[in-house]
Regions:
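Intrinsically disordered, low-complexity regulatory tails/linkers
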Residues: 1-107
Length: 107
């Protein structure tokens, strides 16, 4: 029997694109995927700074273990854009991970 699957979105500022907000979405299947592997793939695809890998993996993992929370906002290790002070509400120096159920268990 197939279990639930989730859609996870990492929302953060992209310094390479005029500091625009960027949503990176991917599917997550418990038992098949892991937060560590997904975060590493984001770094390898140059979508995430390597110094943020462990933070993103940890926050994804926390959200996966409690999907009812729906989202988590956390400070990044990578610095915000030059001259920009960290602002949590605007995700300057912060990132947000969101999760939603896309597939329910099939009996």
């Amino acid at each position: 029997p197939a279990g639930p699957s989730y859609r996870i979105t990492l929302r953060k500022r992209n310094l390479k694109q005029n500091n625009e907000l960027q949503d990176i979405s991917f599917n997550y299947v418990p038992g098949k995927d892991s937060a560590d592997v997904l975060a590493r793939e984001l770094v390898e695809a140059d979508l995430l700074d390597g110094c943020d890998l462990l933070l993103v993996a940890h926050n994804m993992s926390e959200l996966i273990s409690n999907p009812a929370a729906r989202e988590r906002v956390f400070p990044l290790n990578s610095p915000p854009a030059p001259g920009q002070v960290p602002v949590e509400s605007e995700l300057h120096g912060y990132a947000k991970v969101l999760i939603r159920l896309v597939g329910s268990p099939v009996p």
